[in-house]
């Protein structure tokens, strides 16, 4: 029974951190400010997380679990190449839009001046997503016998760059320019171009 409050406190700390990232765009979050927001001492924060880097790692774990598990569901449920790509991009954009503070972590903005391994971990996450997109595009050739005129790795990079750009605009606009704004029209254009290649 004593474990449950500890887990809830950890979750509460991470929720407060994400909220502060949202309400304080461009500002660095200190443990003193976070402790004040949570309503505990800095020492109490460190009882749950040995360092601020571990707090950010907690957010990154949430991001990884949320995105990668949903991408696996898309891969299992959907077989159409273009629909899979659309759903993966849409997932990234909706996730960022629903979690503005966490979008600063995805974008790297919140990690400036923090431990290098945090930025490396986000880079690894995006590399995994790009690999998934590449796999989706390559499977088109296997299933349909017809691929693309451009290498699938180049196309996967282009698709991911589109999503990353939309997330960057969201962060830069202080969460005013929604990542999903005009997505349907943009996707129709992108899909048309992909199918032409």
Curated annotation (Swiss-Prot):
Origin organism lineage: Bacteria, Pseudomonadati, Pseudomonadota, Gammaproteobacteria, Alteromonadales
Record-stated family: Belongs to the nucleoid occlusion factor SlmA family.
HTH tetR-type domain span: 7-67
Swiss-Prot/TrEMBL GO biological process terms: cell division; negative regulation of division septum assembly
Principal cellular location given in the protein's record: cytoplasm
GO molecular function: sequence-specific DNA binding
InterPro entries: Homeodomain-like_sf (IPR009057), HTH-type_Tx_Regulator (IPR050624), HTH_TetR (IPR001647), NO_SlmA (IPR023769), SlmA-like_C (IPR054580)
Subcellular location: Cytoplasm, Nucleoid
Protein task: Required for nucleoid occlusion (NO) phenomenon, which prevents Z-ring formation and cell division over the nucleoid. Acts as a DNA-associated cell division inhibitor that binds simultaneously chromosomal DNA and FtsZ, and disrupts the assembly of FtsZ polymers. SlmA-DNA-binding sequences (SBS) are dispersed on non-Ter regions of the chromosome, preventing FtsZ polymerization at these regions.
Protein name in UniProt: Nucleoid occlusion factor SlmA
Oligomeric and partner information: Homodimer. Interacts with FtsZ.
Pfam families: SlmA-like_C (PF22276), TetR_N (PF00440)
Superkingdom field: Bacteria
UniProt keywords, alphabetically: Cell cycle, Cell division, Cytoplasm, DNA-binding
GO cellular component: bacterial nucleoid; cytoplasm
Location of the DNA-binding region in this protein: 30-49
Gene, per the UniProt record: slmA
The species this protein was found in: Shewanella sp. (strain ANA-3)
């Amino acid at each position: 029974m004593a474990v449950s409050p500890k887990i809830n406190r950890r979750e509460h700390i991470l929720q407060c951190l994400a909220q502060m990232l949202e309400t304080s765009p461009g500002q660095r979050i200190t443990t003193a400010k976070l402790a004040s927001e949570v309503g505990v001492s800095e020492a109490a924060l460190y009882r749950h997380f040995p360092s601020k880097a571990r707090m950010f790692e907690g957010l990154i774990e949430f991001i990884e679990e949320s995105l990668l598990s949903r991408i696996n569901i898309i891969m299992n449920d959907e077989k159409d190449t273009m629909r899979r790509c659309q759903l993966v991009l849409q997932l990234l954009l909706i996730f960022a839009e629903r979690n503005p503070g966490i979008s600063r972590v995805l974008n790297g903005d919140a990690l400036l001046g923090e431990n290098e391994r945090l930025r490396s971990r986000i880079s690894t996450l995006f590399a995994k997503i790009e690999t998934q997109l590449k796999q989706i595009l390559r499977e088109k050739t296997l299933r349909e016998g017809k691929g693309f005129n451009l290498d699938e790795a180049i196309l996967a990079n282009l698709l991911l760059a589109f999503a990353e750009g939309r997330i960057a605009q969201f962060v830069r606009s202080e969460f005013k320019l929604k990542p999903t704004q005009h997505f349907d029209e943009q996707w129709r254009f992108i899909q048309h171009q992909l199918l032409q290649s």
